[in-house]
């Protein structure tokens, strides 16, 4: 059995798990899967709220009761910047600020931090395959991927999974907009778990 690790997840509705039970949030599902591989997780600390932009997450972190260092830190943010029509050019400096904080929370060890792509809410009943939404999500994710590359941290792409939401209705929560617990499980099992297990070896 390995030593227990602590996990800090930073984000918005996609991290707090809007419209799903707490145990179905992807950070909680990841912790359970890690424990199945003999990696206990002592704490899952989530700083996230539905509707938060990068600026609001920054303020939320300042107000949060945190106990760093954390062994693992995730960052999934940006959909609400896109949804509110903020210029994608303003996203990079705000994302870099948050990523630098995430690295600091990981004892200044970037190898313990990962970025998760923004899911595409176009593929939900609420938006019905909107091309303009998908284009906006692609633009934001391109910035996020570049920042991850520049900082040498993993960029985990779950966007393609989210794009199955119209063909597989069970991947969308009852609100017709957010991912279901089943979709979050696919994020973990198909993409996140593999990367994180390599990170904590």
Annotated model-derived regions:
Residues 18-19, 55, 84:
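Short N-terminal helix/helix-N-cap motif within the alpha/beta-hydrolase-1
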């Amino acid at each position: 059995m390995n030593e227990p690790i602590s996990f800090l997840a930073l984000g918005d509705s996609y991290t707090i798990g809007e419209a799903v039970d707490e145990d179905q949030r992807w950070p909680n599902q990841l912790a359970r899967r890690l424990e199945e591989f003999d990696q206990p997780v002592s704490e899952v600390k989530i700083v996230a709220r539905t509707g938060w932009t990068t600026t609001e997450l920054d303020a939320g972190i300042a107000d949060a009761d945190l106990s760093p260092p954390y062994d693992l830190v995730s960052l999934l943010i940006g959909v609400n910047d896109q949804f509110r029509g903020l210029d994608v050019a303003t996203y990079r400096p705000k994302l870099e600020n948050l990523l630098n904080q995430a690295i600091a929370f990981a004892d200044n060890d970037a190898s313990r931090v990962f970025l998760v792509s923004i899911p595409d809410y176009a593929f939900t009943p609420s938006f019905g395959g909107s091309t303009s939404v998908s284009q906006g999500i692609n633009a934001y994710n391109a910035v996020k991927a570049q920042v991850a590359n520049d900082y040498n941290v993993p960029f985990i792409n779950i966007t393609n999974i989210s794009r199955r939401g119209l063909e597989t209705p069970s991947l969308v929560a009852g609100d017709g907009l957010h991912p279901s617990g089943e979709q979050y499980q696919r994020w973990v099992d198909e993409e996140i778990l593999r990367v994180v297990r390599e990170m904590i070896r």
